[in-house]
Every structure is written in structure tokens, then in C-alpha cells.
Amino acid sequence: MTKDGDEGSKSGVSRRKFLGSAAVGVATAGIASQLLTLSAPAEAAVKTNVGPSRAGVGYDVIVIGGGFAGVTAAREASRSGLKTLILEGRSRLGGRTFTSKLQNQKVELGGTWVHWTQPNVWTEIMHYGLEVEETVGLANPETVIWVTEDNVKRAPAAEAFEIFGSACNEYYKEARNIYPRPFEPFFERKKLQHVDGLSAADYLEKLPLTREQKDMMDSWLSGNGHNYPETIAYSEIMRWFALSNFNMPTMFDSIARYKIKTGTHSLLEAIMADGNSEVKLSTPVTKVNQDKDKVTVTTEDGVFTASAVIVAVPINTLHDIEYSPKLSAAKVDMGSQRHAGAGVKGYIRVKQNVGNVMTYAPARNKLTPFTSVFTDHVDESGTLLIAFSADPKLIDINDIKAVEKALQPLLPGVEVTASYGYDWNLDPFSKGTWCTYRPNQTTRYLTELQKREGRLFFAGSDMANGWRGFIDGAIENGREVGHQVATYLKRENDNA
């Protein structure tokens, strides 16, 4: 929403209603979307698509879901010579990434940051010659503001990080024992099993830290998991740290410093153009029926057949499709439990130059709903901030007056001219934000989520071994599954 009071409509969870609503375009005064439909290279790819490798089916592979995992899997399958179709429920590709604009400035409403510790996405960025730019506030702030025991403190970053850094050293001390090889999550299975039932809050409360340190850590944990710390698995927090080479400065840089200069949509478009897949947008899948020879996919507008199907939808929406035969009990259980990621992310334009700041506040405090706010950049118009909250019920990020009030304890006197976010919980094709496992979900479900079921393969950032919940995890898993499908169908055709 912008200062003049225009606001986009909100969407419910009906998939057909969602497709017809203004929320898909998210077009409001001062706010514009960059929807990745089909670029010219991708259109050309559709026109040159080959026929299926065997009779009796319309396609070799159907990919359900056009996020980074689905698009990457489709690229791998199509480059193996397989006729591939992507069915995407939304009117755009991109999944839980969404490049948009706020007052003529590019913003990322979903997945944003990349780093060379994330080998899959970084390889793609280099391969396609994309550039990155920096977000200055989280990784390299000048001033830190934090809430502890419902009081606000402010100090130079070096001073604040002495307090926070010693708390992190204590919190992360077991990470290397649990995840010595972070891309092999079960390398130390017994050690992981021993701690996987703990929540991030459970572990924090038993540590010999001051209340101030625990309040800062609570903010950090909420920001990582995008929910209250008691809903987040302690093992998830350890995983991020392990993937960041067991180093806090590297972790700051890995999770919120570097972003693609031309937007995440530019990487997705490059991957699409490099494949040879057909795409059908605004095509929600309702049923998937597999038999001995093929898979039949029913949408709200038609029926398609293939030799294999890659289901590349978020875990929280897995159960919205009817499967015959039914999916394994583990997949059904995980889908009904849902992952924990469900918080708020928003961009806030303030009139003042507040400098390069970072704020911390525990998820449950009496002063502000924001667990963290940090500077994206400062320019002649003021400051663009990025804000997070653990709970969407606490703040409407598109309500300027509410956002301005929520910022006052942290940044007294700031005037908000625009505030903009996207509620991924209301989006029927995501029903949540980035994937964060709850206690016990890694050891109970991760391996089962990755397993093929007949002609059905499963892909997504939500089931990646490494940077789960990140663009890197989506590409990791999408590439692997695309290769698996190509190998499976080649073997089947060779034996026919």
C-alpha cells in the first residue's frame, strides 16, 4: 500500500477465485508486478517441442508446479530429449519467488538472497552471466537496535555484536557434530535423531545466556524459521549454520546479503529459455492417476497424459491434489502437519534517512510485531527497509498506519510513505512461506518425501538436502529429479 491509500484486494484460499482475483497481479498505486509468463526464448522453445518417445501418451514428462524446482527439473528432462509439459496453477512462473516493484524500485516478495556457499544457484548465476547486488542492513549494519525485556537499546554494530556473537557461539556449538557434512543430512544419523525432537526455543532456554542474549537470539531464530521459535526445529537452525561453513559472518552473507541485480525472475527466465518445455499457466491440477503404463493428470480445464510426472509443489499444498493410488503415509502426514514457515516479509519506504540499521526483537514482546527490520538501501527519497514478523496476525504489512506505528519503538519519528508485502499463507498454491521443518520432521519425513512412487517423482526446495527453503535447494532438488526421470524413462524405453 502507498501513502495515498490505494490497496490491493486480498485473496482467499479458493484456487479458482485466486486465479481471477487482483491479488495475482498485485497491481496497486505505486506497486507493479513482474510476472514471469513466457519470454520470447521460452515461446520459441514451445514451438520447437518434440513428440513423446512412445505412443499412448501426450508427453514424456509432466511437471506440476512452475517454481524454481519445477522449471529446473523440466529443463533437465527436456534437454534429455523428453517432451515435457509444465502445469502451473498461478498466472505466472516462479513459485515462492516474486519480483515486483514498489514506487518504481525492484523488490523481491519471496525468495531473494543467493551466495557462493549455495553451489547450485551460484553455478546457474555464473552460467547465465547474471550480476548480483547487495542488501546492506543485515550483514553489515552500522547501528543495531534491539528489544530486551520490553526495553529498546541502541548501539554501534560492533558493540551489539559482542553481545549477540557470544550468544551465537554458545547456541551453535553442536552444529559441526550434528551436520559435519551439511549436504548429507543423515551422515551422523544418530546425533541428528538425538536432537531432532528439540525446538529452537527448547535449546535456547536451557543455555547459560543472559535474558538480553536470549531475546536477541529469539529474534534471530524467528527470522530464520519465519515463525515462533517453539515451532521451529533446533536441527533446522543448525543446518543453516553448517551450510554457512560454521561461521556467523558467512551465515549473515549467505542468507541476506547478495541478490540478483535484475531480479530472481531473470534467472528463472534464463533456465526456462535453456530448456524445451511447454508451459500452461493458470492450470491448477486436481487429480493425478497412475496405472501400469502412464500417468493421467486432470486439471480444472483438461486432461493430460505422460509416462512420468514430477510433482513440484510446496509440501503445504501436496494434499490439495487427489492421488490414485494414494501417496505414502509419510507424505500424507507431512502434508497435513505442514512446515512451519508462515511469517511476514515486507518492504517499507520511510521518508527519513535512518542509516544502515538492523533491529532485533523477540517474537513475543509488547513493543513491536517486527522481529527484525533492516536497511535495504538509502537514497534521495529516504530509506527502503525490509521487515519480518513471526506471525501475520500481528501486522498487516500493507497497512501504512499500522506499519508506521509498529516502527516507532525502533525508529522513533519515521514516516512511512509505502509498505508492501505478499501474504503467501493466503496463496492457495503455497499456503506458507519458505520451508522450515518442525521438530522431528527431518528424521521422520525427509527421506520419504524424496522417494519415487511408481511413475511419480517429487521435487522441491521443501525436500532438498542442502539449502532447503532457498532457491538453491529448489535448483539442487529439481536438477537431481529431472535427471532421475530421464534415467528412468531411458531404461524403460531401452527395455521395451
UniProtKB/Swiss-Prot annotation:
SUPFAM superfamilies: FAD/NAD(P)-binding domain. Predicted to be exported by the Tat system. The position of the signal peptide cleavage has not been experimentally proven. Keywords: Alkaloid metabolism, FAD, Flavoprotein, Oxidoreductase, Periplasm, Signal. Its main location: periplasm. It catalyses: pseudooxynicotine + 2 Fe(III)-[cytochrome c] + H2O = 4-oxo-4-(pyridin-3-yl)butanal + methylamine + 2 Fe(II)-[cytochrome c] + 2 H(+). Residues 1-42 form the signal peptide. Pathway: Alkaloid degradation; nicotine degradation. Induction: Expression is up-regulated in the presence of nicotine. Strongly inhibited by Na(2)MoO(4) and FeCl(3). Activity is nearly twice as high in the presence of Na(2)WO(4). Disruption phenotype: Deletion mutant can degrade nicotine, but it cannot further degrade N-methylmyosime and use nicotine as the sole carbon and nitrogen source. It is found in: Periplasm. It holds the Pfam family Amino_oxidase. Changing residue 180 to S: Extremely unstable at high temperature. Binds 1 FAD per subunit. PROSITE patterns: TAT (PS51318). FAD binds at residues 69, 88, 96, 113, 285, 461, 471. InterPro entries: Amino_oxidase, FAD/NAD-bd_sf, Flavin_amine_oxidase, Flavin_MAO, TAT_signal, TAT_signal_bac_arc. It is an enzyme of class 1 (oxidoreductase). Its EC number is 1.4.2.3. GO terms for molecular function: oxidoreductase activity. Involved in nicotine degradation. Catalyzes the deamination of pseudooxynicotine to 3-succinoylsemialdehyde-pyridine. Functions as a dehydrogenase that uses the c-type cytochrome protein CycN as the physiological electron acceptor. O(2) is a poor electron acceptor. Pnao is oxidized by CycN 230 times faster than O(2) at equivalent oxidant concentrations. Belongs to the flavin monoamine oxidase family. NCBIfam families: TAT_signal_seq. This is Pseudooxynicotine dehydrogenase. The lineage of its organism: Bacteria, Pseudomonadati, Pseudomonadota, Gammaproteobacteria, Pseudomonadales.
